[in-house]
């Protein structure tokens, strides 16, 4: 697909949209800045005056560090307020209200549907298949429904939240090939660091109808900093930047994120990822042996989806032990399930001990 044709997927009324030209987007140079109506003085709470001025809309140092981390060019990357902002930009930028659909694969992260609803974009569900080896995406069905429903965006969460399953790259490539010129395939890799499946970013050179979502909220432990990344065709990124709010990345958040991507910090992160993966295997095996546990799904994320004979009792037992997990019982097809994030060894042991006590009490 050519660069011009990928822009054909964008709403026609936005293709020439100039967006808001902020004071920080100009190329002017000087040492006295009086062009943005900022205060000339620092706030007493900000003695270093680090937050007196508006931030760079796309901090160059952070953008370069993220591009190096994810294996793309800086111009293929947009930094936003978590992946949520990137999802919202994609839906608003590509979907004509009431016409262009958004395809999702439930059970899955709810923000895709929320953003579609806010844009009045029809929502198309192609449920994950619940098989003996866990949930899986039905790529032929996804492609068929996307083509039949005029879907502009196809969200593939890999690893999927809350299902935990990942999609092989050859399957993602099948979807990309079948939907060229028809839809943008968005691979959400929020939990990619914990997965055995390589990132789909490596397919960008061959498929312009691919976008990848990444975040520093999970493996990099910066959830409160709200640093999300959209990786896609450079021309699409440039257009979406014009649709983005003027100053999406606060200076303190950008500074912390850049420090988190230094070599020493990344080494610590890699060790913690390895610990999570090890705990994932241990806790999976331990949960599967507990009476009252109906099924523990395989996971490529930092969490486990677990079905219980009595999910209410399990949920309450964990609360009584001071452990808060994600109740999935209101989610269609997960009426007996809880999602348990993997914590430290000690935290995971509290989960197992609380559930063990519950089962002993029942027995």
From Swiss-Prot:
Pfam families: Aminotran_1_2 (PF00155)
Keywords: Amino-acid biosynthesis, Aminotransferase, Histidine biosynthesis, Pyridoxal phosphate, Transferase
Enzyme type, top EC level: transferase
Enzyme Commission number(s): 2.6.1.9
Modified residues (N6-(pyridoxal phosphate)lysine): 218
Organism: Xanthomonas euvesicatoria pv. vesicatoria (strain 85-10)
Molecular function, one GO term: histidinol-phosphate transaminase activity
One of the GO biological process terms: L-histidine biosynthetic process
Reactions that this protein is recorded to catalyse: L-histidinol phosphate + 2-oxoglutarate = 3-(imidazol-4-yl)-2-oxopropyl phosphate + L-glutamate
Similarity annotation: Belongs to the class-II pyridoxal-phosphate-dependent aminotransferase family. Histidinol-phosphate aminotransferase subfamily.
Biological pathway: Amino-acid biosynthesis; L-histidine biosynthesis; L-histidine from 5-phospho-alpha-D-ribose 1-diphosphate: step 7/9
Assembly: Homodimer.
Residues annotated as signal peptide: none
Name of protein: Histidinol-phosphate aminotransferase
Superkingdom classification of source: Bacteria
CDD domains named among the record's database cross-references: AAT_like
Cofactor(s) in the UniProt record: pyridoxal 5'-phosphate
